[in-house]
């Protein structure tokens, strides 16, 4: 899997770039790196693609006599490979983490005939092991109250000792009314969750929103981390909002206060959202009247955590809501969902539930989706499914729960497939027996939430939280399961 790392150029850097190079004669002074992978404290695995933004790199590698270097704390020096001439420009360099760089904090710098850039800390991380075919679920700390339609996000917050935290935001209780509650729990060394703690409540009740966390490792925020709650449903019947809330996080994980940032172009609930290279991407969902939409947008995260303007991207092939959404490498994926008009709390399987998987690649040089747009994969989900979740890592995806033909017996509660380097997917298989949440007392569920996270040892875990009960739709689950 190739993961691209992009350094984003500020307006000040762009102005500095004007006249910062003498063209074919090479740089007039030392290069300057502004950001890597859109992040303040970037990280990546061996072989990960590194995209460096800044200025005065020289118009080409040969003209600049340039190199990108990883330097280790032990004094080692590893020079990266620039695959093509187009990967080195005066403002941006694309390369990969070289084989042999040790795991841990290293420094990255650019050297040219004009000098050497100030080193940037770049942490090499081990590739996570994620094999959904061998999943075995374990119950961990349950929610204080049963919920469905809640948003879940996880992040490792920086500090002397980094803290991994899981957030549960909003959602609907047994009355189906949205809630304003915000809960968080820290992750133990073994991957279990600690007690759920209450945090500052949302400015207004919300359900069926999307949530993501910006940290210095995935965005250009300086020092602090931020929790975003995007869109959502403000009533039990599905009235979407365009509001984007932003919560400032303490080092221990608590939300210390809420504000708002740039609203979505249109109200939507049950959408998908991810952060990649300092940018938030959102897709699909349900708009006015609960009709599914196909829109896709992106907004760049600023150093103070605020979002820039939302920019339209190539739309999904057709409208889609209540779907699985995520990113693997540089590809966005949308799996299953419903293309019709469905209320959030409807427990029946719609005739417009879908089984297809679509994907689109992000151009790391611009942050936009490539001109190709979305491609429908040849491999489909085992069944049409909606109101499910999808968690992706290390070239695999795990699809959990939802409404599908056979959901009352948990026939295909868990399914998994491979995500290939070119974006395509391999065929999906089902996990049964001891590999299901129902087998450990979790019941059959939909309108739940799921996320992936790392424990302190670097092990990757998948978490499934709450949800509606398929067999008794008025029942909300408190159960939380991980593996």
Model-flagged regions — what are they?
Residues 15-17:
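C-terminal motif of bacterial Sec signal peptides marking the signal peptidase cleavage site
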Residues 19-70, 75-81, 115-133, 139:
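Beta-strand/beta-sandwich contexts
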Residues 1-10:
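Bacterial N-terminal signal peptides that target proteins for export
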Residues 50-54, 68, 93-95, 106-111, ...:
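A structural motif
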Residues 113-115, 470:
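Short, solvent-exposed loop/turn segments at the edges of extracellular beta-sandwich modules
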Residues 46, 86-94:
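Ser/Thr- and Asn-enriched, surface-exposed coil loops between beta-strands
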Residues 99-104:
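Surface-exposed, short loops/turns at beta-strand junctions within beta-sandwich domains
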Residues 125-483:
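Kelch-like beta-propeller repeat domains
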């Amino acid at each position: 899997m190739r993961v691209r790392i992009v350094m984003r150029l500020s307006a000040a850097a762009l102005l500095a770039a004007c006249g910062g190079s003498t063209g074919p004669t090479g740089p007039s002074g030392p290069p300057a790196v502004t950001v890597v992978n859109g992040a303040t404290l970037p990280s990546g695995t061996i072989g990960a693609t590194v995209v460096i933004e800044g200025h005065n790199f020289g118009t080409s590698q040969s003209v600049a006599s340039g190199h990108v270097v990883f330097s280790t704390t032990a004094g080692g020096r590893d020079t990266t490979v620039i695959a093509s001439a187009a990967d080195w420009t005066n403002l941006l360099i694309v390369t990969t983490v070289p084989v042999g760089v040790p795991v841990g904090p290293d420094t990255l710098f650019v050297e040219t005939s004009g000098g050497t850039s100030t080193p940037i800390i770049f942490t090499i991380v081990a590739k996570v092991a994620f094999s959904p075919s061998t999943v075995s679920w374990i119950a961990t700390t349950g929610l204080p109250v049963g919920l469905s339609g809640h948003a879940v996000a996880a992040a490792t917050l920086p500090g002397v000792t980094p803290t991994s935290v899981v957030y549960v935001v909003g959602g609907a209780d047994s009355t189906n009314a949205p809630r304003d509650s915000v809960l968080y729990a820290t992750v133990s060394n073994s991957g279990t969750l600690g007690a759920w703690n209450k945090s500052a409540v949302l400015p207004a009740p919300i359900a069926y929103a999307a949530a993501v966390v910006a940290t210095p490792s995935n965005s250009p925020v300086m020092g602090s981390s931020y929790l975003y709650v995007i869109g959502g449903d403000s009533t039990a019947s599905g009235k979407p909002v365009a509001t984007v809330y932003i919560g400032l996080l303490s080092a221990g994980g608590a939300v210390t206060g809420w504000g708002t940032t740039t609203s979505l172009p249109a109200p939507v609930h049950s959408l998908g959202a991810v952060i990649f290279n300092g940018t938030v991407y959102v897709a699909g969902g349900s708009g006015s009247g609960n009709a599914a939409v196909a829109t896709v947008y992106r907004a760049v995260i600023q150093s103070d955590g605020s979002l820039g303007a939302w920019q339209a991207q190539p739309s999904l092939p057709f409208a889609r809501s209540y779907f699985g959404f995520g990113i693997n490498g540089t590809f966005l994926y949308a799996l299953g969902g419903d293309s019709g008009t469905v209320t959030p709390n409807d427990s029946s399987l719609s005739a417009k539930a879908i089984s297809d998987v679509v994907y689109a690649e992000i151009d790391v040089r611009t942050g936009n989706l490539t001109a190709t747009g979305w491609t429908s994969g040849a491999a489909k989900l085992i069944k049409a499914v909606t109101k499910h979740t999808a968690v992706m890592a290390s070239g695999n995806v795990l699809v959990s729960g939802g409404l599908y033909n056979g959901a009352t017996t948990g026939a295909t509660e868990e399914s998994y497939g491979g995500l290939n380097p070119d974006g395509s997917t391999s065929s999906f298989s089902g996990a049964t027996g001891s590999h299901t949440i129902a087998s450990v007392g979790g019941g059959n569920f939909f309108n739940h939430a799921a996320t992936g996270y790392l424990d302190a040892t670097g092990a990757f875990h998948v978490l499934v939280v709450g949800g509606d009960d398929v067999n008794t739709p008025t029942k909300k689950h408190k159960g939380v399961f991980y593996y």
